[in-house]
Amino acid sequence: MRAARTPQALEIVATGTLGAEVRGVDLAAAGPAEIDAIKQAWYRHDVLVFRGQRLTDDDLLAFSRHFGALDPPPNQGAGRKSPPGYPDVYVVSNVRDETGEPIGALGDGEAQWHTDMSYAALPPDASMLYALEIPASGGDTCFCSMKAALQHLTQN
């Protein structure tokens, strides 16, 4: 795929029908031109991947707020888990602490196929995931383009 060049060496590489990888940006220090380019990429590709980021909880929230007001995280399963002082950060993890307790809201099981908060009267426009540890391969986080699915339906 051909990469699109945007402000200060920011590179948008489309990954196919859905998604793009954004390269050459530090989300903790992104300026207005980069944020605008990221928003335009999001509008076009729906799912964006930013590899190699090192964000604090404050950085994650500041970047997230460029896309609008934050919705409170849901309370599910083992209960909502947030870092102390960061109720808008929702920890999802399959890791258990030294006492055997899940450190994240979903315990150590896989989440079922779902759409984030689609049950809400006004669902959020997006979800932001920040992975601290990822497997070398696999990992079962997948995305589906409902726009592409609709375009491929027959008229019948």
Regions found by a protein language model. Give the residues of each.
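Non-heme Fe(II) oxygenase catalytic core, chiefly the N-lobe of the double-stranded beta-helix
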Residues: 1-156
